[in-house]
From Swiss-Prot:
Binding-site positions, Zn(2+): C149, C152, H169, C176
Lineage top rank: taxon: Eukaryota
Name by which UniProt lists this protein: Baculoviral IAP repeat-containing protein 7
The organism's taxonomic lineage, starting at the top: Eukaryota, Metazoa, Chordata, Craniata, Vertebrata
A Pfam short name: BIR
Protein's organism: Xenopus tropicalis
Each BIR repeat, start to end: 7-73, 115-180
Compositionally biased intervals (Basic and acidic residues): 288-297
Description of its domains: The BIR2 domain is required for caspase-inhibition.
Length: 365
């Protein structure tokens, strides 16, 4: 996808209802069509943007949310043709392979018979006909009702009665080349337009799931970075939670990495105090005569290894599907609460309810 012409070709499945921004301008700014809806991704930094509004300029939005993108930093020369990007620099700075491959991800499942054979252990309670699923390019992963496309590696689950595999394939993975070859552009475009123009799937309604971990009214949103040992170390020194949370989120969004040590975080906290005031550190005052010191509390018993592992697994679990690990950071709120499969379904952050303007893939160590 380094070629602007190749990125423009990716927009052949771009829904006609998405008229707020030009596909040509998106391709010129480094984006190719990802889907579903109006989701696009930068070929260089991997940044994803969606929910385009009238007046949005792709190049401006790209620089706003992904200022460290190698494509933006090293791009030179007039737009059009092949973008002049240093391949060596791009290889060092980009987290993903930018060139799109049209080869199947799982070639061993390229045959429909092989895919159908994978459904030998398909649960009886599961919805979805194995014959139809296999015909639409899916094979069974062996877990619950999870299936994957052999070509694009797109995964689907939680099948309901009446779901059509081809329609779901086109809805969530419109750039799959196998889907494009079999069903054609017209089918994909019709699915995209019918689904993402309906009121039930508008940006205002998608993502309002019951049971989502939404903060109660008046309470501050929970920052996932505060559970790290680095953040806990700073909090124990007396720094304010909101200041620690803000710095850690900004650091991750701007650099893609977290603070490596408490001292590094404390240095930035002190610098922030010098700019915004020194009220971040709370100094305990001596008790007055009328105050009686509280008796020391007994230390809590140490957690067992099993309990620590359980808590760690719970912290890293996707808060929507409760199955995969969290891996997507929402922009601009910075919350890290969902996996790559659930992120495309959300239009608002399930934690703070802020509108999701983009997302960045996070790789947990």
């Amino acid at each position: 996808m380094r070629s602007e012409a190749e990125r423009q070709r990716s927009f052949r499945a771009w829904p006609h209802t998405c008229r707020t921004v030009s596909p040509a301008e998106l391709a010129r700014s480094g984006f190719y069509y990802l889907g579903p809806g109006d989701r696009v991704q930068c070929f260089s930094c991997g940044g994803v943007l969606r929910s385009w509004e009238p007046g949005d300029r792709p190049d401006t939005e790209h620089r706003k949310f992904f200022p460290s993108c190698p494509f933006l930093q090293v791009r030179r020369g007039p737009p059009g043709g092949t973008d002049s990007v240093d391949g060596q620099i791009l290889g060092q700075l980009s987290g993903e392979e930018p060139d799109r491959t049209w080869e199947p991800v799982c070639p061993q499942m390229a045959g429909e018979g092989d895919r159908l054979g994978s459904f030998s252990t398909w649960p009886r309670y599961a919805n979805g006909d194995p014959q139809q699923l296999a015909g639409a390019g899916f094979f069974y992963t062996g877990h619950r009702d999870h299936v994957k496309c052999f070509h694009c590696d797109g995964g689907l689950r939680n099948w309901e009665q009446g779901d059509d595999p081809w329609t779901e394939h086109a809805k969530w993975f419109p750039m799959c080349d196998f889907l494009l070859q079999v069903k054609g552009e017209a089918f994909i475009r019709s699915v995209q337009e019918s689904f993402f123009s309906s009121p039930e799937t508008s940006p205002e309604s998608v993502g309002s799931y019951e049971g989502s971990p939404v903060s109660s009214p008046g309470s501050p949103p929970v920052c996932p970075f505060l559970s790290t040992s680095v953040a806990q170390g700073a909090l124990q020194m007396g720094f304010k939670r909101n200041r620690v949370s803000s710095l850690m989120i900004n650091r991750f969004i701007l650099t893609g990495s977290c603070y490596g040590s408490v001292s590094e975080l404390v240095t930035d906290l002190i610098q922030a105090e010098e700019i915004h005031g020194t009220e971040s550190v709370s100094v305990p005052r001596a008790p007055t005569q009328r105050e009686r010191p509280e008796p020391p509390k007994e230390p809590a018993p140490p957690l067992s290894t099993e309990e620590q592992l359980r808590q760690l697994k719970e912290e890293r679990m996707c808060k929507v599907c409760m199955d995969n690990d969290v891996s997507m950071v929402f922009v601009p709120c910075g919350h890290l609460v969902v996996c790559t499969e659930c992120a495309p379904n959300l239009r608002h952050c399930p934690i703070c309810r802020a509108a999701i303007r983009g997302s960045v893939r996070a790789f947990m160590s």
